[in-house]
Every structure is written in structure tokens, then in C-alpha cells.
A protein has these predicted regions:
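Fe(II)/2-oxoglutarate oxygenase catalytic core
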Residues: 1-156
Length: 157
């Protein structure tokens, strides 16, 4: 099935800087997060139990004082430009990077183990591009979309 899920990448040194920022950040608390556990049967296999992670909820304004965040948003802007060049129909649309974002850490055995899909409402129906960056290689992780029949490996950058 055709889709518009694009596998761009950012400079991996920025990934290392973001991990260092996550580990050493003292101005914003890290929050443990656990979604309500659920399981579903998909093609004869049980899939998922929810989401368990430790999240750092940040605001883009921090990028004015934190170099690694500025470099990250510069790289995201470059990726958006490349995406729009590949999917030329999107070029006339406004692109804005959301002010709020998360850096999430998954310990062994944790993760987001449910299918990715859009829960549409009035606000999300206007969004046509979402992004995610893996800060480390994770051979046991990745992101999978059921209806697009697409799997993206958890690869750094």
C-alpha cells in the first residue's frame, strides 16, 4: 500500500547530544509514564500492552539557550524541506514544528507496543506530518503502522 511515511535522518552526533541533555537535564523533571495496558488480536497474534517510558516533556523555547535543541530543530527543518521536495504536492502547505515535544527513554522490556494509527479529531485532521527520531539503535524496536503495512526499524538518527 502506498504511504507517505518517510525515513529521513539527522546527524547522529545530535542524537548523542540529546541523550546527554536528557541524562543531565535538571530544569525539567523526568516523568514515568505508563499507559493503560491493553492487548489486541491481530492476524492470530496478540499485539501490545501499552506504553511504558520515562519522558522529558520540553518546550521549543528551550532551544534558545540549549545548543543541542537548536541543532536538533535545525535538522528537523532540513528534514521537512527534504520531505516536501520528495512529496511535491505538500510544498504549498504551511509547515510548523510543534512547540511541545518529548524525549522518551525506554528501559529493557519497556516501549510503545501498540499499533500506530491516527485518532482523528478536528485538530489532528489538519496535521499531515508527524515526526519521530530514534536517538539510539534498537534492533528489537521500531515503529509499525498496521494499515499502511509499514515497519521502520529503530535506527539511530
Amino acid at each position: 500500500m502506498p504511504d507517505f511515511i518517510w525515513e529521513g535522518n539527522i546527524n547522529t552526533s545530535i542524537c548523542d547530544q540529546l541523550l546527554n541533555y536528557y541524562d543531565n537535564c535538571t530544569i525539567v523533571p523526568k516523568l514515568s509514564f505508563q499507559a493503560s495496558p491493553t492487548q489486541e488480536m491481530v492476524e492470530g497474534h496478540f499485539r501490545g500492552h501499552g506504553k511504558t517510558s520515562t519522558d522529558l516533556h520540553l518546550h521549543m523555547i528551550l532551544s534558545h539557550n540549549e545548543g543541542c535543541l537548536k541543532y536538533y530543530f535545525d535538522e528537523l527543518s532540513r528534514c521537512i524541506t527534504e520531505y516536501m521536495e520528495e512529496y511535491t504536492w505538500s510544498g504549498g502547505m504551511e509547515s510548523v514544528i510543534s512547540d511541545g515535544f518529548n524525549i522518551q527513554r525506554y528501559q529493557p522490556g519497556e516501549g510503545y507496543t501498540l499499533w500506530h494509527y491516527e485518532r482523528t479529531n478536528g485538530e489532528l485532521s489538519k496535521r499531515f506530518l508527524a515526526w519521530m527520531t530514534y536517538l539510539t539503535d534498537n534492533p528489537d524496536g521500531g515503529t509499525e503502522w498496521l494499515h499502511q503495512e509499514k515497519y521502520v526499524a529503530g535506527k539511530k538518527g
